[in-house]
Amino acid sequence: MTLTFSSSAATVAVAAATVTSSARVPVYPLASSTLRGLVSFRLTAKKLFLPPLRSRGGVSVRAMSELVQDKESSVAASIAFNEAAGETPSELSHSRTFLDARSEQDLLSGIKKEAEAGRLPANVAAGMEELYWNYKNAVLSSGASRADETVVSNMSVAFDRMLLGVEDPYTFNPYHKAVREPFDYYMFVHTYIRPLIDFKNSYVGNASIFSELEDKIRQGHNIVLISNHQSEADPAVISLLLEAQSPFIGENIKCVAGDRVITDPLCKPFSMGRNLICVYSKKHMNDDPELVDMKRKANTRSLKEMATMLRSGGQLIWIAPSGGRDRPNPSTGEWFPAPFDASSVDNMRRLVEHSGAPGHIYPMSLLCYDIMPPPPQVEKEIGEKRLVGFHGTGLSIAPEINFSDVTADCESPNEAKEAYSQALYKSVNEQYEILNSAIKHRRGVEASTSRVSLSQPWN
C-alpha cells in the first residue's frame, strides 16, 4: 500500500561499474524543508493551504476532511491553471466517487461502482476493499478518539488517488522528486501512516546524530544511510519519528527504490510522495527474460543520475543493501536484519568517494515490520496481500563508520569489501536488538546502552 523499497539496493552492484564521471544528467535540488498543506496551487501569489499535521498519536481528522471538501475547489483551480496553459488536466474527467464519500458504505459501494463501470480492474478493486478493512481494524485498535472518522477521511483520499492513478497512470523518471503540488503527496503519506504508529511505544536512538546530519548536508556534504528494510512504511516511519526534531531529514531523503513501488496501483500514490532513485530489483531482474536488457539499461541511467547528484553535494541517500525486506526466522519467528550484499555496499561507498564532495556513511536501523508486514516469501507477481497494524516503531543511527579505519589490516580489496559491509551490518544489528528490547519487550528508554541512547523527540 505504501512504499516498498526492497531489492533495489542490490542492483547497485549490477550497474555501478558503468557510471562514469562523463555522465551529464540534470541535477535536482533538495526539496524545501517548509511543511506545506496538502493542496496548493501556483495560480497567483496566493496559495491554498491546509494546516500541517502534527498530532503525536493520531491524525488531524479535520485536516483530512477539509482536503476532501476542498477537492471541488482544487479541480476548479486546476482547470483555470491548465486552461491558461492550453492543457486539459486529468482531474477534469476524473470520477468524484471517492471525493464525495462520507461514510464506510459510500467507500465500499464506490469500489463496486467503479469496478462495474470498468474504471477499476477487478484485482485492484479487490485489493482496495481488503486494504480498507485491514486499515480500519488497525486504526480502531489504536483506541484513538474519532477513529472511524479518521479511517473514512484517510481512505477516501487514498482511494481517490489510486483511482486517478488507474485513469491517468503516472510515469516515474529515474530520479523522482516528491510531488508536493497541486496535491501534496508527501503530507498525504504522513497523514495516512501516522494513525498506525503507537508513539507511546516508539523510540529514536541517538537523535542528536540526525541533527548533525542536517548540518553536514547544509554544508554540502553527502550522507548515505545504510540500513535494514522492514516494511512498505519505512520512509514514512523515518520522517514521522524525526518530524518534531528534524523535518529536514524526512523531506530531503532520497530512497533507492525497487520498480514494484512504481507499478503497483495501490503503491503508486504513496511513492509519488517520496524522493526516489528508481531501479529494477536484482531479485526480479530475470522474471521476464525479454526485459532483462531494458532493466539493466534503466538501472545504468538511474546510477548515472545518482552519481551526478552526489557530485553536486548536499545529498542524503538511503539504501538497504540486503536487497529486500527483512523476514522472520522460519524456525523461531523472530525478526532480524537481513544480511547485506557486500557488493552493493562497496559500490555505494565508491560512488560517494568519487563524487568530489565530502561524504559520510552511517549505519541506521529500523524496527517497524508490524505496521505493514511483508509476505513470508518474496513474491514474483505484483499486488501482494497488504496487512496493516497499529504498533510501536523504532529508528536508530550510529556514528559514521570510516572505510579506512575498518580495513586497515585487510590484505585484499575483496577482504576489505567484506569487512566494511560486516562492520555496517554489525552496527545495524546491534541497534536493532536495542530497539527490539525497548519496543517488543517494553523496556522503553531503559533499553539504552552506552552506544545507543533512546528518546522520544516528539515529547
Curated annotation (Swiss-Prot):
Compartments where located: Plastid, Chloroplast stroma
The protein's name: Glycerol-3-phosphate acyltransferase, chloroplastic
Annotated transit peptide: 1-90
EC identifiers of the protein: 2.3.1.15
Stated role: Esterifies acyl-group from acyl-ACP to the sn-1 position of glycerol-3-phosphate. The enzyme from chilling-resistant plants discriminates against non-fluid palmitic acid and selects oleic acid whereas the enzyme from sensitive plants accepts both fatty acids. This is an oleate-selective acyltransferase.
Motif (HXXXXD motif): 229-234
Protein family (similarity comment): Belongs to the GPAT/DAPAT family.
Molecular-function GO term, any one: glycerol-3-phosphate O-acyltransferase activity
Keywords: Acyltransferase, Chloroplast, Lipid biosynthesis, Lipid metabolism, Phospholipid biosynthesis, Phospholipid metabolism, Plastid, Transferase, Transit peptide
Primary gene name: ATS1
Database matches in Pfam families: Acyltransferase, GPAT_N
GO cellular component, one term: chloroplast stroma
Domain observations: The HXXXXD motif is essential for acyltransferase activity and may constitute the binding site for the phosphate moiety of the glycerol-3-phosphate.
Catalytic function, reaction form: sn-glycerol 3-phosphate + an acyl-CoA = a 1-acyl-sn-glycero-3-phosphate + CoA
InterPro entries reported for this sequence: G3P_O-acylTrfase_chlp, G3P_O-acylTrfase_N, GPAT_N_sf, Plipid/glycerol_acylTrfase
UniProt-listed GO biological process terms: CDP-diacylglycerol biosynthetic process; phosphatidylglycerol biosynthetic process
Organism: Arabidopsis thaliana (Mouse-ear cress)
Pathway: Phospholipid metabolism; CDP-diacylglycerol biosynthesis; CDP-diacylglycerol from sn-glycerol 3-phosphate: step 1/3
